[in-house]
Amino acid sequence: MRAGAYSWRSSAKAIERLKSAKSEIRSVARKDPVTAAEGVIALAHRIWPAFEHIDTSSGALGSAVNRTLEDLLPILIEAPADEKTRAKWLEQLREAILDDGVDYLAPIADRFGEIAAYPALKNDHADRDLVLIRAAWSDHARFSHVTTATLMLSCLLEAGRHEELLQLLALKRTRMWFHEKFGAEAILRQGREDEALAFAESLLRDDRQHWGYNGIARFCERILIHQGREEAAYGRFGLPSASGNTYLAMWRDLVKRYPGLDARRILEDLIESRGAKGKWFAAAKTAKYLDVALDCAAQPDAAPATLIRAARDFAIKEPDFAVQVGLHAIAHLLAGRGYEPSPFDIDEAVGHVMAASARTGQEDQALRELERLAANASADPQMLARLKSSIAEIEKGNG
């Protein structure tokens, strides 16, 4: 993590180093939380100088930094440090934030007030740039960015200076959630739940509703759930804000957030609201809703390769399901669907269909289904020829 240690294409190496650093700090935290907290600060200081020259266009490194800091911040916040020690830490973090070239340290700025811990420190860092920020936000003729604005808002919030925070935000020409979230939280901490909900939800009604949507939705969702309005929270904010790198991850995210709701219903709601039904096959299959999975498998956007793997994996434990999935895969291949399909995919799918049907004594019925598919004159010629060849081999073997 030395300055300039990573070159343009070193994103993967940098991410691995972050993982190692996080592991080291967590290990130390079990025995010496103060030293571990200082490790978090040292890491924060080194991130920008070390990663400055890396190509971050994919977003992978930024996400990794964000996750790392969010995971480590509790160590820094909860460390049993006295006021003098924390004052030193805050100066170091403030310097790192000011030097940060791409806002890597945003998670630290967001929780700066919590890191400060002591009232005097919260007020000190809230007041330092208050006049400058007030002047910058009052000048609507020019745009002025103040690097310490977020940490200042965090300190105002944690110091309990809620009305002052709201008055400051009211000066801004544009409303963006990365700052407005402090105002929403300030209203909520005063016990004005409905006002906080309206404040946050109002940001979804302007032209910038897509930026920061998930953060706004989660805030509103939290209020409604606290009020016992789970259905409203789910329909208005939970379902639209489901997130994950895969369709299965999106479903699991919602199931975890709404343990009181039927998991099957959540899956069906996601499919209906997000579309691309065929893409949900793997999620439905893994969730063990096989009837839903079969419905997904029949859709034109289902991936034949995924269906073929499922036919293989389920041939023993769910042979009827495997047969149907394999037949859908063949139908898609005949229609020319799939990513770089090969005639060998037909061979594999047919093999899984026949193997699964043999376990239930339905080989003849499976063969008739294959013949029905082979009767499609409009099918891809190469795929069709391969299917007919496979059928001939089966019939020859039966004979």
Task: Please state what every model-predicted region is.
Residues M1-G399:
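Eukaryote-biased, non-catalytic alpha-solenoid scaffold regions
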